[in-house]
Amino acid sequence: MSSSMKAPLRNPPRLLAGEGRVHLSASNAHPCFSTSLAAYPLKLLSPTPLPSQPANFAVLYTLAYGGGLVAGDLVSLSVLIDPGCGLVMLTQGTTKVYKRRPGLRPLSHLHTSQPSSDPNLTRQRMHIRLCSSSFLLLLPDSVSPFRSSIYSQTQRFVLPADRTASVLILDWVNSGRGQRPQEGDEEIWSMDSYGSTNEIWVGDERIMRERMVLDNSHFGLNAGGSLSPIANQLSPYNVYATVLIIGPHLTTLFSYLAYLSDHSRQFQLKEPPGLAWSFSEIDDKLQAGVVRIAACEVEDARKWLREVMTAGGVAALVGEGMWPRCI
């Protein structure tokens, strides 16, 4: 064979429907995505770094074609973050979950690695592995499950055993379409079921596991019917959020939340407040903790999160230009 002949280019690996693979690698300037692959209905976007953006991190948007997921969809994303790199993961608007949507992706979920026994189930899975001194900020918009949808989400974050990596995970859900006077309907917490599980591992040790389950499936809800049992139980709140934090990059935020928690008193009131929150310290040495929030409106929760994260130094991690786009 002539030495001048070039080796044939490798074709990118074939992905299953809804599968994504990301590898964030270090470079001389900003970290770069040495791998960024996605198959319909998943879409990945990486914007050009802003001038004010610190040099040690990159931004990735995860999107669904059509702005939502339907029954039978499976989205499975795996991410690797190299040493010293930071990744900010965002969305562009709420992730809407439909039971069905005529004309949308009739072939999107015919071939998956693990077919679901329930064709009405919508699934999202994420597995993110961080290397030494790396960090992740996962700050999506809230999930919006619509009437009769069945949604299951599992997210696992694996940090190195040397305890030098950090993650901040925002996981939140809203009540759906809400009041729809034109339809003579209130579509509030009217999904069949919603489940979300988050796990954080440090080496081989699981440090945190948070699970939220909302289940209306046994109550036989009908379109145009009365409020669901879940809606009555969760009233007056239309958004619930969980924030998991761990690692040395988030020491200021951990300390600030602990201070706020120690100096805040939420007394028993005749009427529930517009926003209620709590902070639980999981491991002081690892700077690990969990924030739980209930709010009447998504914007109430967003405002509180933005104020606390800004005061806790998260804005400084991403720069003044990028921060307003994060939360």
Curated annotation (Swiss-Prot):
<keyword id="KW-0472">Membrane</keyword>
<keyword id="KW-0843">Virulence</keyword>
<dbReference type="GO" id="GO:0016020">
    <property type="term" value="C:membrane"/>
</dbReference>
<feature type="glycosylation site" description="N-linked (GlcNAc...) asparagine">
    <location>
        <position position="120"/>
    </location>
</feature>
<keyword id="KW-0143">Chaperone</keyword>
<protein>
    <recommendedName>
        <fullName>Urease accessory protein 4</fullName>
    </recommendedName>
</protein>
<feature type="transmembrane region" description="Helical">
    <location>
        <begin position="239"/>
        <end position="259"/>
    </location>
</feature>
<keyword id="KW-0996">Nickel insertion</keyword>
<keyword id="KW-0325">Glycoprotein</keyword>
<keyword id="KW-1133">Transmembrane helix</keyword>
<dbReference type="InterPro" id="IPR002669">
    <property type="entry name" value="UreD"/>
</dbReference>
<dbReference type="Pfam" id="PF01774">
    <property type="entry name" value="UreD"/>
</dbReference>
<comment type="function">
    <text>Urease accessory protein required for the maturation and activation of urease via the functional incorporation of the urease nickel metallocenter. Plays a role in host brain invasion.</text>
</comment>
<dbReference type="GO" id="GO:0016151">
    <property type="term" value="F:nickel cation binding"/>
</dbReference>
<keyword id="KW-0812">Transmembrane</keyword>
<comment type="similarity">
    <text>Belongs to the UreD family.</text>
</comment>
<comment type="subunit">
    <text>URE4, URE6 and URE7 may form a complex that acts as a GTP-hydrolysis-dependent molecular chaperone, activating the urease apoprotein URE1.</text>
</comment>
